[in-house]
């Protein structure tokens, strides 16, 4: 018996049971089906058991099944209630899928990013099954409408699903993108093991967390920003009260830090604007902002750090940390008005460091700390500056360092003098081992155009 025939046989029996059920039972079954599709273990296990019993009762247990499924029952479940051929990737059923952070379904073709390369997989998903899958996923998220053509959905295990269809795509070439986190232990030691940072950098970052600087995590898409912030935050003190604001429920902080009083809000754009005043009146020790990308998020971040808040953290899409303050200030002033110079000054004086991440060009699955920037503001000279503390050498797969400690950082460090001494010692040791020889300070010309009269000081 072919796999398709087995699936049809099981579906026929399930359809018969559905028709004989009363309205209450149907509603209950429908809710269970939704939860099974979204990956809830209890409901998924129940339907696997039902399918297994049908296969046994019908005497079709010797039927064929595709090699990407672990068993006939598992395959039938995923074809009817699961993610079809995507299931082995979504639930890490092979070593290569455990190493894969993203998958794309383009038309009926499935591509998985494995060791930094998008590989075409043997399993295909036809148009009818894709439409069934989209409808099933959207049933579990009532706010999403199939005709909208663009959707973002999250599975139970945290996988983010982005669906493009309808008029947004070419005929028969609808797209479903899946993203998952492959880092199992959110520790600096794990980042060292993966080669993202060097061992002494892990020690440095832990001391920086102890002191409590405000940090930006920057980089392009799929560079590891969110994961790095998760590692940083998971090393934070658990007795402090925090507030996490994101545009989508991507990071389950209640799971990652169950003992920490960390409130989680999902808001963006106008919703975020409406909440700003109440958020600023809160008594949180720090704030996390995931995916800052518009004027509302930029202004909220600035309002929070301008109150003297420490330990705040944010991720932002950029490959240019030096010009990031200008971009943020431009968006804020265009939307809300104000002085560009004043906003830029607040950014340089409020955020202490930018942790810049990247993927290696020869393997996009490998993440690296690309650079560590220090933002400084000299009030006596009304002069912001960006100092390159660390940079990654792609060819040598190593890092170079340059010691610098701004006066504003020293002031913050007075509350933790022992940690501050340790931080300075680590930075000097790193510089001595592998130094950046040239001058790396940049005085952004966008702050005061007259700096262009002495362009060698701008670094731009």
Q: What kind of region is each of these model predictions?
A:
Residues 368-460:
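NTP-binding/hydrolysis catalytic cores, primarily Walker-type P-loop NTPases
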Residues 231-348, 357-359:
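Switch/coupling sub-region of P-loop NTPases
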Residues 167-188, 224-249, 447-459:
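An exposure/low-complexity boundary signal
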Residues 343-379:
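Phosphate-binding/switch region of NTP-binding enzymes
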Residues 99-211:
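P-loop NTP-binding catalytic core
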Residues 163, 205, 247, 287, ...:
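Conserved RecA-like P-loop NTPase ATPase core
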Residues 189-264:
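Phosphate-binding glycine-rich loops and their immediate beta-loop-alpha structural context
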Residues 1-144:
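N-terminal accessory targeting/assembly segments
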């Amino acid at each position: 018996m072919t796999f398709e025939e087995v699936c049809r046989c099981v579906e026929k029996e399930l359809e018969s049971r559905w028709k004989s059920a009363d309205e209450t039972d149907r509603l209950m079954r429908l809710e269970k089906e939704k939860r099974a599709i979204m990956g809830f273990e209890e409901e998924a296990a129940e339907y696997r058991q039902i399918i297994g019993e049908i296969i046994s009762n019908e005497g079709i247990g010797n039927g064929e099944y595709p090699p990407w499924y672990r068993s006939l029952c598992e395959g039938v479940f995923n074809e009817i209630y699961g993610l079809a051929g995507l299931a082995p990737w979504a639930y890490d059923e092979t070593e290569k899928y455990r190493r894969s952070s993203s998958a794309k379904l383009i038309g009926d073709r499935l591509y998985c990013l494995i060791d930094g390369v998008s590989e075409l997989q043997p399993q295909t998903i036809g148009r009818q099954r894709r439409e069934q899958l989209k409808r099933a996923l959207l049933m579990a998220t009532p706010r999403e409408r199939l005709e909208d053509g663009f959707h973002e959905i999250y599975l139970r295990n945290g996988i983010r699903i982005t669906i493009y269809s309808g008029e947004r795509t070419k005929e028969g070439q609808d797209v479903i993108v899946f993203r998952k986190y492959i880092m199992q232990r959110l520790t600096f030691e794990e980042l060292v093991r993966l080669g993202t940072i060097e061992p002494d950098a892990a020690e440095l970052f832990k001391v920086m967390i102890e002191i409590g600087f405000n940090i930006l995590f920057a980089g392009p898409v799929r560079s590891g920003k969110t994961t790095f912030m998760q590692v940083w935050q998971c090393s934070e003190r658990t007795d402090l009260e925090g507030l996490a604001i994101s545009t989508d429920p991507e990071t389950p902080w209640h799971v990652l830090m169950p003992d920490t009083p960390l409130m989680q809000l999902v808001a963006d754009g106008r919703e975020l604007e409406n909440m700003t005043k109440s958020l600023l009146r809160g008594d949180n020790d720090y704030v996390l902002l995931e995916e800052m990308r518009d004027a509302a998020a930029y202004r909220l971040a600035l309002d929070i750090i301008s109150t003297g808040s420490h330990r705040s953290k944010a991720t932002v899409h950029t490959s240019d940390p030096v010009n990031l303050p200008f971009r943020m200030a431009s968006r804020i002033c265009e939307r809300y008005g104000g002085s560009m110079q004043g906003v830029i000054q607040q950014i340089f004086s409020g955020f202490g460091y930018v942790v810049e991440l990247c993927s290696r060009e020869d393997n996009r699955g490998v993440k690296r700390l690309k650079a560590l920037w220090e933002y400084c503001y000299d009030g006596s000279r009304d002069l912001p500056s960006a100092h390159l503390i660390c940079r990654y050498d792609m060819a040598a797969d190593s890092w170079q360092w340059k010691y610098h400690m701004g006066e504003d950082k020293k002031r913050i460090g007075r509350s933790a003098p022992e940690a501050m001494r340790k931080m300075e010692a680590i930075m000097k040791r790193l510089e001595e081992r592998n130094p950046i020889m040239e001058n790396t300070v940049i005085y952004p010309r966008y702050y005061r155009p007259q700096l262009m009269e002495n362009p060698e000081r701008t670094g731009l």
